[in-house]
Amino acid sequence: MASNNHFMNSRSNLSTNSDAAEAERHQQPVSNSVTFARRTPSGRYVNYSRDDLDSELGSVDLTGYSVHIPPTPDNQPMDPSISQKVEEQYVSNSLFTGGFNSVTRAHLMEKVIDTETSHPQMAGAKGSSCAVPGCDVKVMSDERGQDLLPCECDFKICRDCFMDAVKTGGMCPGCKEPYRNTDLADFADNNKQQRPMLPPPAGGSKMDRRLSLMKSTKSGLMRSQTGDFDHNRWLFETSGTYGFGNAFWTKDGNFGSDKDGNGHGMGPQDLMSRPWRPLTRKLQIPAAVISPYRLLILIRIVVLALFLMWRIKHKNPDAIWLWGMSVVCELWFALSWLLDQLPKLCPINRATDLNVLKEKFETPTPSNPTGKSDLPGLDMFVSTADPEKEPPLVTSNTILSILAADYPVEKLACYVSDDGGALLTFEAMAEAASFANMWVPFCRKHNIEPRNPDSYFSLKRDPYKNKVKADFVKDRRRVKREYDEFKVRINSLPDSIRRRSDAYHAREEIKAMKLQRQNRDEEIVEPVKIPKATWMADGTHWPGTWINSGPDHSRSDHAGIIQVMLKPPSDEPLHGVSEGFLDLTDVDIRLPLLVYVSREKRPGYDHNKKAGAMNALVRASAIMSNGPFILNLDCDHYIYNSQALREGMCFMMDRGGDRLCYVQFPQRFEGIDPSDRYANHNTVFFDVNMRALDGLMGPVYVGTGCLFRRIALYGFDPPRAKEHHPGFCSCCFSRKKKKSRVPEENRSLRMGGDSDDDEEMNLSLVPKKFGNSTFLIDSIPVAEFQGRPLADHPAVQNGRPPGALTIPRELLDASTVAEAIAVISCWYEDKTEWGSRIGWIYGSVTEDVVTGYRMHNRGWKSVYCVTKRDAFRGTAPINLTDRLHQVLRWATGSVEIFFSRNNAFFASPRMKILQRIAYLNVGIYPFTSFFLIVYCFLPALSLFSGQFIVQTLNVTFLVYLLIISITLCLLALLEIKWSGISLEEWWRNEQFWLIGGTSAHLAAVIQGLLKVVAGIEISFTLTSKSGGEDVDDEFADLYIVKWTSLMIPPITIMMVNLIAIAVGFSRTIYSVIPQWSKLIGGVFFSFWVLAHLYPFAKGLMGRRGRTPTIVYVWSGLVAITISLLWVAINPPAGSTQIGGSFTFP
């Protein structure tokens, strides 16, 4: 590993030789000199860098490499105005690979999938070939995919041949006439026929332009974020500007009027007189509901305390062991209920106003004359790991719902993390990008909801309701047919890849055998053994995981891969035409940026499962698009409400939104049986607990459907965070707080410390925190600035000026993608704080809860966004065994949290006490399983022994029991009232609480203790996702009985209680002096336990009617036999034989 540190100081190398031997990975690391070039069909190497990398990177102090591009007669630097137009086309058509001790390669792919693609943004899109003899390179194209032809004779020519022609006299190879214009930028702009964009700042490198937004904020504006400063007046009464895209008033004071002064002009007084409208509102629970709710909690706490005191004082001398066990369990249950109930004291609801969002960010204003979207960028993360358990069709539908979301196209980017590195997932994403060419414009034209094609075409409601366009029926029929063909292509991909690989493998074997025979003449030739590779559609080896795993091509050992499936869209709307199958006139046909990412995996490096994959996406997206906000989805969760992203952005862009670390959306599920047998909807958690936490510091992070602030993931403190420096005891021996000299507006970029040196974040330590990528480090202040709310009101602190985000997005170049390859390599996180303080936190099965806890612990807040129409929907395991394993994984993560430093006992003073109790309950709840199992056996032990937990059922005990039960029911009814759930959902949750508590939670505690005490690591298999292919029976998985050891405790509890009831009845009936009170008490509690386990018993029976009758007969006979045998062995007092006085009371 000695070469590792040396290699970390250099960026990955880039070349386009895709046929080089893969053994190069084992060679010594390359030098720090990196060449960015590609080879043309004529053998020339052409520079394709968009900026002068030497000048750009040389200005950074932390740079440990240099870039050398030696000029030759055939390789002269190209004019930036020409190269920028073609650079993204090259990037989107190239597959970038690289990693540890390997060269970063850009493999130019003329074909990504077997089918033809036509969208100009897509990789491998079909186009015309160069007409110059001996050249087959694609012709340059514009945003619409139309050919860029520099000569009036329309001779088709590629970029390289055009540059050759310009250098050799400027003559067109077709008509032999000189080119009238040799600048591609000019005729490209004429071909687009779009409005001119706001110009970038004059001069400066790409890095200067990238950081100029942040530089512009180092002005008096940032030092004046106080309530006494009028931002509107400063902006419109001075000639100064901050940020890009701002406008100031003309001398006549009118804006928006025509040349004659007529029109609806608006002056600064008109703007300042308009009332400021918030983006969100907090809706308090009615006092008629919440006040009795809190009063009942107080009453129940008092009654529980009195009851436990009475139970401790009044022992049962006849069965002291039974009394002791019951009291210990009741004490724990009281503590567990208290930890669960206290955080529910302050539930709230929230509402958003999308009209205000549109008015503030997408309406023409003096600071945004063109009305371009001023919303911040948003990077969407979709994670998948195994195409066998997570069907590619499900993942493709999720991608399509994201691409069709109602959010500015140029501000949206989608990153797909394929942690398995499978070619099947890669080609499925390419097929989805191709189908999006039709699906996304169709959704925009007809306002389709939901925008997941599989869910939309499976709707059981009338699809033509509220549709007024005459061509909707024709369009829907056409798109439905295309989607059916798309599904067939996706389903046939595994066989297609296998057949293709077999064909190429056979060809390679034949070539090798011919070569071997030629070299050895007539000698006996041994069979040639060639590794069976997986081949891509363009006839090259897949750099990821092969179907038949081999060295450097397995799930845990493969190179990093990045493919830009859809290149970034143009800044201006691109309207379709009436030609083709759909009339897309006045419909924007642009598609968001879509990137396939598979991080590098190598033996000896811990991959950290999903958390590691998410952190790799965070770094790659920071370099490629750097959206200040991130929303992550599991591959089986899709956008059900196309405006959900806007609703989440309302919270982030509202006043005080800069202190929000994330917006959590509730999880809603499809494909669950109508009775919700195993409480898959989990509505008590998502609609009761999460709403209650929203009234504190915010809900916990649940792993999917969460909108993050990027800098919160980076481990920064929130703006205006209160600093605490507790000593041994913060109450008595606290140290004095230093007075910070760091400006208030810059505190969001601090990671602790108060000195002037800390204001610069100790630049020498930055690589130790984030790694050695200067691109990544430079993107941090840009993301922080762009994520601020608008400074459109004096009360808005730490805001940004309106119109600052209307500038065009920078184009992707190969050097940027190469840097992204470097940051997803297996070695990048070595000796950094990724996973410990930055990004998703490692070390727990439930990395989501720990990640959210760390943010709240630093003082950030979160909000819960419940939309009228579900924001996201997904699938959940409806099979009993799968559900228990899911609960086991969650509970194991909680046990890990309890035994780690993430225990809420060690939370910082920034966390509120009730929020701390909520996180403490997250770590403690699995331990209830021990007491729950004991308590479930107590009724049976009572019936077996003829004793009860109390000596007699006196009035005091019954009154306490009645009050506790009534308060519990009333609290449940009030929770149902303010949360909106149903009584059946509440009861299903209670049932599964006992089922999970007696099975999965017990196993989780045992596994957690084994990990802590013995160091035994815990591994879980990926939960299989349903592909929705079983049309005949949607709930077929519900009836499948798959045995697991988790079923043993609940089955034992049921059997013991059933036998105990039979024994109790037999004992009482044959007793000389029947004690019916003890029997009734024991039978009542046994039936209460069995009622909770009813869904579990129903799941064991499988499909209704399929359980043989003989099973019930034998079960009854066994129960009767055991009960009679017990009575014979231990006869009732006063009876000498079975029989005797058989009398009813």
UniProtKB/Swiss-Prot annotation:
Where along the chain is the active site annotated?
Answer: D419, D848
**One Pfam family, short name:** zf-RING_4
Which InterPro entries would you find in this protein's record?
Cellulose_synth (IPR005150), Nucleotide-diphossugar_trans (IPR029044), Znf_RING/FYVE/PHD (IPR013083)
Residue ranges with Polar residues bias: 1-19
Tissue specificity remark: Preferentially expressed in root hair cells. Expressed in roots, leaves, stems, flowers and siliques.
- Chief location bin: Golgi
Q: Name one GO molecular function term.
A: mannan synthase activity
The transmembrane segments are 289-309, 319-339, 930-950, 956-976, 1002-1022, 1045-1065, 1079-1099, 1109-1129
Organism per entry:
Arabidopsis thaliana
Print the organism lineage.
Answer: Eukaryota, Viridiplantae, Streptophyta, Embryophyta, Tracheophyta
Modified residue annotations for Phosphoserine: S755
Can you cite a GO biological process for this protein?
A: response to cold
Where would you find this protein in the cell?
Golgi apparatus membrane
Q: Which Gene Ontology terms of cellular component type are present? A: endoplasmic reticulum; endosome; Golgi apparatus; Golgi membrane; plasma membrane; trans-Golgi network
* Record's protein name: Cellulose synthase-like protein D3
Ranges for the region named Disordered are 1-38, 189-208
Alphabetically sorted, this entry's keywords are: Cell wall biogenesis/degradation, Glycosyltransferase, Golgi apparatus, Membrane, Phosphoprotein, Transferase, Transmembrane, Transmembrane helix
Which Gene3D superfamilies does the entry mention?
A: Spore Coat Polysaccharide Biosynthesis Protein SpsA, Chain A, Zinc/RING finger domain, C3HC4 (zinc finger)
Spell out the family assignment given in the record's similarity comment: Belongs to the glycosyltransferase 2 family. Plant cellulose synthase-like D subfamily.
Report the domain of life of the source organism: Eukaryota
* The keyword Membrane appears for this protein: yes
Mutagenesis or variant effect for E829K: In kjk-3; reduction of root hair growth
